[in-house]
Design a protein with these regions (language model features):
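Proteolytic maturation boundary segments
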Residues: 1-103
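M16 family metallopeptidases and their MPP-like homologs
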Residues: 1-6, 77-79, 84-173, 185-193, ...
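Ca2+-coordinating acidic residues in Ca2+-binding motifs
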Residues: 72, 128, 233
């Protein structure tokens, strides 16, 4: 069975049944090599940095948490819970956020959180990173809010070291991948063009403009915004 689906638009020309069948037969005749899975044995961080030191340790009597101050000024709050014994949750935050950037970066900020990890980290593409992390219970995602910069993650106790390595890589070695970004942009533009055919979207846009006094920071992303979005600029903002 061959199926073809797409939006019902006058400017889109779909292949005929005969053309689909012809392409299907051609594809069957092409030589296809068996897929070979390649997984790198390279460590996430080839050379570990010099370890830091704990400058101060104290107890928060209100929450029963341990508060550490590291020699780089970062404060770490450790709180033991018994909600889930095989999971460690981590949230890191610092003042900052999207409001620190001017009007020229508003469109870049609309896709900022989606784009910054597209290229992977360190020596690993996003695809290779997923392969290396297969079988591990670990996740790490940097992001930006209105007035904060954040890194959220979780790990099983056995994979906590991997979580810290990912945090380090996203801080020190974010990776660009132009091909991955182009694929993301093309998908988003196609999705947004179809979305904008829905009259309820136009209604929602008008409502948002009225509520937020036409503030461009509150507007949703549109297909046209990608003309102003710059992948290199986003990665520069991230760093």
């Amino acid at each position: 069975v061959i199926g073809l689906t797409g939006p019902d638009k006058a400017d889109i020309k779909y292949p005929t049944e005969a053309q689909l069948l012809e392409d299907f037969i051609k594809a069957q005749q092409l030589p296809v090599k068996p897929y070979e899975e390649t997984v790198s044995n390279e460590p996430l961080i080839p050379e570990l940095p010099a370890p830091g030191k704990i400058r101060e340790m104290k107890t928060d009597p209100l929450f029963g948490a341990t508060v550490l101050t590291l020699d780089n000024g970062i404060k770490v709050v450790l709180k033991h819970t018994d909600f889930k014994k095989d999971e460690i949750l981590m949230t890191a935050t610092s003042p900052g956020g999207s409001t620190l950037f001017g009007a020229k970066d508003i469109d870049n900020l609309k896709v900022f959180n989606d784009v910054i990890t597209l290229g992977g980290a360190g020596n690993f593409s996003a695809t290779d990173l997923n392969k290396v992390l297969a079988g591990k219970k670990v996740s790490c995602s940097p992001s930006i809010g209105l007035n904060t910069e954040n890194v959220n993650g979780y790990a099983a106790p056995a994979d906590l070291k991997t979580l810290f390595e990912l945090v380090y890589l996203y801080f020190t070695a974010p990776r660009m991948d132009e091909e991955a970004y182009t694929s993301f942009e093309n998908r988003m533009i196609a999705q947004l063009k179809n979305l904008e055919l829905n009259p309820m979207v136009a209604f929602s846009d008008t409502l948002t403009k009225a509520i937020y006094d036409n503030n461009p920071r509150a507007a949703r992303i549109t297909a046209g915004d990608f003309k102003q979005i710059s992948y290199p600029r986003i990665m520069e903002m991230y760093k």
